[in-house]
Amino acid sequence: NFSYAIDDDDENQVTVDVLKNFNLTIEKGSFVAILGHNGSGKSTTAKLINGINIAQSGEVIVDGQKVVDDETIFDIRRKVGMVFQNPDNQIVSSIVEEDVAFGVENLGVEPEEIRKRVDNALKTVGMYEYRLKAPNKLSGGQKQRVAVAGIIAMKPMCIVLDEPTAMLDPSGRKEVLSTIKKLNKEDGITIVLITHYMDEAVQADRVVVMDGGEIKLDDTPQNVFSKFDEVKSLGLDVPQSTELIHRLGLKSENTILNADDCVEFLKKTLEAKV
C-alpha cells in the first residue's frame, strides 16, 4: 500500500497525487496486465516496482525487500527488469549480442557465464541467428525482442513491460507478445504488462484497470470485460469480439474475448435459431 505525488508547478509548488492509497499484490509467476487511459498512473506504477521512482508513503516490497534506498535498489533492479515503449531508446551497442551482454557485464559476471547467458537469452526470444547483426538493421519487433533478451540474460524474477508494443506494427506486436507469454508459461517469469491493447490484456491471467491513480477493477479478463459499461465509462475499449457480441444484443454464458470464441458462439447461436 503506497502513495506517490509530483510537483506539477515548480513556482507555486502545486502537488498532484499520481497514486493514492494504492494497494496491489502480484503473485510470483503470474501474468498481470495493467490498463488505463493516459495519466491514470500505469507507468508510475511500473517505475515504483523497479525503484526508478520511490513511494512517498507506504511501502513497495519486491521478493521480501523494501524498495526504499540505494541499499536495496541494486538488488531490486536485478530481480525486476524493465522494457520500455521505444526499442531504439534501449539499444546501447552496434552488435546484437554485445547489446544483450551489456547488462550482464555490469553485474560482474564471469566472461564464460556471460557467453552462456547471452546465447540462451537470444535463443529464448528467437533472435540467436541475428546475434552478429547490427540492431539498426532489425525490425521494431526484433529490436524489442533483443531488449527483452538483454533483460532475460540478467536472470530477473519479474519483467515489467511499459507499453512495449505501442510503436510496433501488428507483426511486431505478435512477436513480442508471443515471447512474453513463453517467458511466463515456460520459464515462470512474473510478467507485468502495461498496455493499451485489449487483445493483449485478455491473454493475461489477471487484468488491473486504473483511473485517477486508483485501482477500479482487478480480476480475470473474463470478469473485467464482462463489466462492459463500467470499462467503457473509464475511457477504455473492450476486445473487438466482446464489442461485437454486445452490439448484436446477444448474451453468452462466458464473456467472449477473442475471434475464435466469437465465431464458435455465433455459429451455435445461428444453429439454435434454424
Per-segment meaning from a language model:
Residues G58-V68, I76:
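Conserved ABC transporter NBD signature motif
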Residues L35-H37:
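The feature captures the beta-strand-to-loop junction immediately N-terminal to the Walker
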Residues E112-E129:
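Conserved ABC ATPase "signature" region
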Residues A134-L138, Q142:
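Conserved ABC ATPase signature
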Residues I159-D162:
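Catalytic Walker B motif of ABC-type/P-loop ATPase nucleotide-binding domains
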Residues N50:
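Helix-to-loop junction immediately C-terminal to a conserved catalytic motif
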